[in-house]
Regions:
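Non-catalytic, structured segments within soluble enzyme domains
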Residues: 11-14, 107-288, 423, 427-439, ...
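Conserved catalytic neighborhood of penicillin-recognizing serine enzymes
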Residues: 104-128, 182, 247-270, 363-418, ...
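Active-site loop and adjoining helix of the penicillin-binding protein/serine DD-peptidase-beta-lactamase fold
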Residues: 140, 196-214, 274-286, 296, ...
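N-terminal type II signal-anchor transmembrane helix
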Residues: 1-42, 83, 103
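A penicillin-recognizing enzyme superfamily signal
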Residues: 280-300, 310-311, 322, 329-341, ...
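Short, well-structured active-site flanking segments
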Residues: 85-95, 167-170, 229-232, 335, ...
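Soluble, non-transmembrane domains of envelope/secretory-pathway proteins that act on or interact
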Residues: 1, 42, 228, 243, ...
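Active-site SXXK
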Residues: 76-77, 222, 290, 317, ...
């Protein structure tokens, strides 16, 4: 009686412990997720290009169950856990069978580990013991409560060992057969899925006879467990092909692991936030053509050893190619990605300054600008050749890349406004960041690229022009979805069409088929040679120089970088024609301009001509013809030249009122239209300049400067 009571108590205690044990266990999936898979990189067509091995140097991939052949799934269930879908993590029927077989034989000849228990063992390896088995069983039941059978089977097939450093069905399929797991037939699946019991003993590359014996046993298990019809096991074993690869040569895994396009993949991985399947926008064929062209041109430049290029698809804003080094394996600095390095940009920033001036209504392509010696304090810029042209059209000043006209425009726009512009183009840090103070120290010299910018950021900025003035961050991924707040209108389509017209006026030597809008740049001291060009389809940036900063006489944008840019574009369009430029006639209407100033003609302008203007931005009237001096100026009634205190929302609401009506209003060089005298406009803290212009030319313009403080 006492013995029976004790047995009953022990049984009750054991059953209670068995029932409650899972509630004291944590989820094994948390440890599985620490076993990260290989990172795979794919091109824009979905072709696998590169594999980075795991942190523990394993071959392991995470693929969904749907990408594993049903044959492989059936084989693994038959061989490892035929009643997988009928238990809760522990197969009590298998436990009873194993216990009886082991008891009657006097030794352990059979196990009862389910797929769930094996997965726990993979997640949390422990020394084998009865205690370990109990813990595994409890954790397996916990896992089954938290996760579906589909999830558990997927994790298992992705993590089971297949010999050496091969883990998971996908890595095994690639290593042993050169196939994806989806392509495995029944013979191949049965050979592979026999490995996990003793992975290294059954490896077909080292022990083919043992592997075939194990395969035959697995096929018999499939037949016995109802996964195959009677007689099918022998039929598959004898007749279905085993497409084993030639083991005398390295596997595809090895070839995918070789260095290639590393700089591109690094950028893509960062953007993908370290995802393990990275869908890159790279075009490998274009990249190879670009790399070849850069290498050919470097050999022709004395004292020049490095080059880089970035190619952006204007429609998608995808970085189609990034070449950051000519030889990644160069022991000195081959792994330095010069496409993201900060270098002096020379004259490459000038188109952005002209764009801003056009959008401010300050000028058009026919406006006359001075090219004479100029001094601002201690700063006295000169042109590259040391010569001056006195006066010339804006289009010529930009096309010839003259320095003093660009500096004059920055002075009129103000350096603060230009720095804000560069921030909008992501060429500099945001204006509210500490780094923005560094930009402000450069003053007017920012027109000549003294701040330093990267090839990638400059190419991204140039891509705004063929995109009609809309900034969208460039992406290295085909899966990127840019949030709406990242899209920003920087320039009007009118101004972009005008700059494109100017930059494509001079054809590059060798540009026989494409028709490129282009701009070169040379840093002070011949340290860097740049050329940026774009078509309706692509934006391309090219840099030549030395990574160690060593100058060379050959480093001139027009003679070093421009020829390479032409060759690359011709290579890109080798098998296709470029898209035509969109019709810009509606954006660039012809209007009367003053022959003396190239500004909007007034009745005071005795000589006039018809010139190109912007459709959406009024060009400022000519103020150089003599009648202006005889006219009474407009009186700006509000605001007054004084200090205003901002309201609670951080702005000051002020009316714009003048002594006459109508009036064209400009705020900080931005045209805002004909405001009603009863409308209020919000002004942020800082210095502001209001300019009033009479559209009827009966009064001369006037301006007022005031300050808003917090």
């Amino acid at each position: 009686m006492v013995v029976c009571a004790a047995a009953a108590l022990f049984g009750a205690a054991a059953w209670t412990a068995w029932s409650l044990a899972p509630s004291f266990c944590s989820d094994p999936f948390t440890d599985l997720k620490k076993q990260t898979p290989c990172r795979s990189y794919y091109d824009r067509q979905g072709k696998l290009l590169h594999i980075e091995r795991t942190y523990d140097y394993q071959w392991r991939f995470d693929i969904p169950l749907e990408q594993i052949s049903q044959e492989a799934v059936d084989v693994i269930l038959a061989a490892e856990d035929a009643r997988f879908y009928g238990h809760n993590g522990v197969d009590l029927q298998a436990v009873a069978r194993a216990a009886w077989q082991n008891l009657t034989s006097g030794r352990i000849i059979s196990g009862a580990s389910t797929i769930s228990m094996q997965l726990v063992s993979i997640a949390r390896p422990r020394k084998r013991s009865f205690k370990t088995k109990f813990i595994q069983a409890a954790e397996a039941r916990k896992m089954e409560k938290l996760h579906s059978k589909h999830e558990i089977l997927t994790e298992y097939l992705n993590r089971i060992p297949f010999g050496g450093k091969i883990h998971g069905i996908q890595a095994a399929a690639i290593y042993y057969f050169g196939l994806d797991a989806k392509a495995l037939n029944r013979a191949e699946a049965s050979l592979l899925c026999g490995l996990p019991q003793r992975p290294n003993a059954y490896r077909p590359d080292r022990h083919p006879e043992q592997a075939r014996k194990r395969q035959k046993l697995v096929l018999k298990l499939m037949e016995r467990n109802g996964f195959l019809k009677p007689g099918m096991a022998e039929e598959i074993y004898e007749n279905e092909p085993l497409r084993l690869r030639d083991f005398r040569y390295p596997s595809a895994l090895r070839s995918y692991a070789r260095p290639s396009h590393r700089h591109y993949f690094t950028m893509a991985r960062r953007e993908a936030r370290n995802a393990f399947d990275v869908k890159c926008a790279i075009d490998v064929e274009f990249t190879e053509r670009i790399q070849h062209a850069l290498s050919q041109h470097v050999q022709q430049l004395q004292g020049v050893h490095d080059a880089a290029a970035v190619l952006i698809d204007n429609r998608t804003r995808q970085v189609v190619s990034l070449v950051g080094t000519l030889d990644y394996n160069d022991p000195l600095n081959g792994q330095v990605n010069v496409a993201t390095a900060i270098r002096s940009a020379g004259s490459t920033l000038k188109p952005f300054i002209y764009l801003e001036a056009f959008d401010a209504g300050l000028a058009t392509m026919d406006t006359i600008i001075k090219d004479t010696p100029i001094r601002f304090g201690d700063y006295a810029p000169t042109n590259y050749d040391g010569r001056f042209n006195q006066k010339l059209r804006i289009a010529e000043a930009l096309s010839l890349s003259l320095n003093t006209p660009a500096v004059r425009l920055v002075a009129e726009l103000t350096p603060e406004r230009v720095i804000d512009l560069f921030a909008s183009l992501r060429l500099t840090a945001p204006t509210d960041s500490p780094d923005a103070q560094t930009a402000k120290k450069h003053g007017l010299s920012i027109a000549l690229g003294t701040m330093g910018h990267s090839l990638l950021n400059l190419a991204q900025g140039y891509a705004v022009i063929p995109n009609g003035g809309l900034f969208t961050p460039a992406t290295f991924l085909t899966t990127s979805s840019t949030p709406p707040e990242e899209h920003e209108r920087v320039f009007t389509p009118d101004a972009c069409a005008l700059v494109t017209k100017i930059l494509s006026m001079r054809r590059l030597a060798g540009d026989v088929s494409v028709g490129i809008a282009w701009k070169t740049g040379t840093s002070n001291g011949n340290h860097d040679a740049w050329c940026f060009g774009y078509t309706a389809d692509y934006t391309l940036g090219v840099w030549f120089g030395n990574k160690n900063g060593r100058p060379a006489a050959a480093l001139v944008g027009a003679s070093a970088a421009a020829p390479a840019l032409v060759d690359i574009f011709n290579a890109i369009y080798r098998n296709s024609a470029p898209s035509p430029w969109p019709d810009s006639s509606a954006l660039l209407p012809l209007r009367p301009l003053c022959a003396k100033s190239g500004l909007a003609a007034t009745p005071s302008c005795l000589k006039q001509f018809t010139g190109t203007t912007l459709q959406s931005i009024p060009l400022r009237p000519c103020d150089q013809c003599g009648v202006f001096a005889k006219k009474a100026p407009i009186t700006i009634l509000s605001p007054q030249p004084e200090h205003y205190v901002a309201d609670g929302d951080g702005t000051a609401k002020l009316r714009l009122r003048a002594s006459i009506s109508p009036v064209l209003w400009y705020v900080d060089n931005d045209y805002i239209g004909e405001n009603s005298p009863f409308d209020k406009r919000a002004f942020a803290p800082g210095r502001h300049v209001i300019r009033a212009v009479d559209p009827n030319d009966t009064a001369s313009p006037a301006s007022v400067t005031f300050v808003v403080t917090k």
